[in-house]
């Protein structure tokens, strides 16, 4: 247990942080034809990526104090880089609802639309 500015940070807290940031890192991998909220805006993705990077910089040094997350805490960074393979061309892809189906799309979906038939 580590006492940090009158706050007790335990390995359990670090484990929760690891699960939290890993979950939000891999959210863009969720692809469903029925998804009405297609994640097709680079702006939204990059803002989340920036928040993740800043948080890891702040919370990361605490990871060695955790027996759970010390070797695994930085794994999400390998998947959130700007040149990472899954997100090199991050835009609307065929799994997004098509306009011809009358789907109500969020406004940001029209920013980078590339629906292919």
Swiss-Prot record:
UniProt-recorded name of the protein: Putative uncharacterized protein YLR169W
| Transmembrane portions of the chain | 9-29, 56-76
The answer to keyword Membrane applying to this record is yes
What is the topology of this protein in the membrane according to its UniProt annotation? Answer: Multi-pass membrane protein
Source organism of the structure: Saccharomyces cerevisiae (strain ATCC 204508 / S288c)
| Keyword annotations of the record | Membrane, Transmembrane, Transmembrane helix
Query: Which cellular compartments is it found in?
Result: Membrane
- Transmembrane helix is among the record's keywords: yes
Its principal location?
A: membrane
Question: Beyond the main fields, what else does the record say?
Answer: Partially overlaps APS1.
Q: Name one GO cellular component term.
A: membrane
